[in-house]
Amino acid sequence: MAYLPNRGDIVHLDFDPSSGREMKGPHFGLVLSGKVFNQQGLAMICPISQGAAAAAARTYGTVVTLVGAGTDTQGAVHCHQLKSLDWRAWNVSLKETVPQYIVDEALARIEAILFE
């Protein structure tokens, strides 16, 4: 059976095409939509950056750090760059799953962006 992304999965994908301050190229992303939505072929995914990009993004107040989360993937989840992507077309593959508190924190940041 083919992989179906689920909320809390860290996946590998390529964010091109993109423009402006959006993340470009191959990166990891955090899936925030659930399986029912994802079965339609789309998934809501926030890109994850590492290194200097992650440090700079922390000044936005819209990122969630993976440092100390117990994941192999480190860096910052960019909640301000949430994207709806056709995960089949982007050949998304599973890397690992984050603890629930990371998902909760990311969803809270997105809620603040949209409703505050």
Could you describe each region identified by the protein language model?
Residues 1-116:
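Conserved functional hotspots at enzyme active or ligand-binding sites that engage polyanionic ligands
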